[in-house]
Design a protein with these regions (language model features):
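Mixed-charge, low-complexity intrinsically disordered regions
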Residues: 1-80
């Protein structure tokens, strides 16, 4: 698997706030085993914090429209 391109630099590990207000910790980037799509590995910092989740990097990094305003889906708030 040495012929794989390097993973993107962002998002960096740390605390991010979802546009709906909850905080999450990005643990790192991973690849889908079949498609090699880059996914963001993260966990909620509320409720069950032991569960790990993945979301396509493109979706994690995209913008959303809320009340007519364009904003990031996730915003980095700390290195924590």
């Amino acid at each position: 698997m040495s012929d794989l391109p390097p993973l993107p630099a962002e998002p960096l590990p740390g605390r991010y706030r979802h546009y709906k207000g909850n905080d999450y910790r990005v643990e790192g980037l991973v690849r889908h085993s079949e498609t090699l799509e880059v996914l963001v590995l993260y966990r909620a910092l509320y409720g069950d914090t032991s569960a790990l989740w993945v979301r396509p990097r493109a979706m994690f990094m995209e913008t959303v429209v809320v009340d007519g305003r364009i904003q990031p889906r996730f915003t980095r708030v700390s290195n924590e």
